[in-house]
Amino acid sequence: MANLGCWMLVLFVATWSDLGLCKKRPKPGGWNTGGSRYPGQGSPGGNRYPPQGGGGWGQPHGGGWGQPHGGGWGQPHGGGWGQPHGGGWGQGGGTHSQWNKPSKPKTSMKHMAGAAAAGAVVGGLGGYMLGSAMSRPLIHFGNDYEDRYYRENMYRYPNQVYYRPVDQYSNQNNFVHDCVNITIKQHTVTTTTKGENFTETDVKMMERVVEQMCITQYEKESQAYYQRGSSMVLFSSPPVILLISFLIFLIVG
């Protein structure tokens, strides 16, 4: 880890040193220097975007920007944006006044999906989060009747689990036990309110299905937890701290 931090330090020092030198180099074509900040003005080639109507940019009587008598931006008598007498946007005389009304905010489906994938905290459940949707596992129960019953009714069983952060549990068994209990309880209550009841066979199968999904959720959350811990260790190492301090010095200086 220390070797990695040292190599990162060397790489960023070389990069930012070059950028720091570039920032200190004088720029040609400054104010009152030989070069022009806007090549094309005052040269034989003319401006890349010549003004229309005979007037220069920002000059009166020729359609300049922000000046009267020429249809400038935001000025009367010339059809400016948002002003009367000229059919501006959102004002009298225009044909598109409704365009000035603010549009209603729309909920992004990507944001909703991202919240579900990351594990959204469920209100009223004491800090439990709802995991992302999973494919229901293929489970064999030991006899043809239950196997067939499961295949025909698996759509009635949960495909998401409720869980708490893994750092609140001492081991996987405690996480899975709590995850199974709260998930089956919530799913049963929700389904019962819709007028559907579960048999003992349904409960038995739900326990097996939810247990497999809770194990999968634990493995996923544990991996993410250890990755976050590794990142914290990396950024707390002395070489990385020195690197960050040096970058701040270059940016401020």
Curated annotation (Swiss-Prot):
Residues 1-22 form the signal peptide. Residues 52-95 have a biased composition (Gly residues). It is found in: Cell membrane; Golgi apparatus. SUPFAM superfamilies: Prion-like. This is Major prion protein. Cu(2+) 2 binds at residues 69-71. It holds the Pfam family Prion. The keyword Oxidoreductase does not apply. Residues 23-38 are annotated as: Interaction with ADGRG6. Glycans are attached at residues 181, 197. A lipid is attached at residue 230 (GPI-anchor amidated serine). Residues 23-230 are annotated as: Interaction with GRB2, ERI3 and SYN1. Residues 26-108 are annotated as: Disordered. Residues 51-91 are annotated as: 5 X 8 AA tandem repeats of P-H-G-G-G-W-G-Q. It comes from Colobus guereza (Mantled guereza).
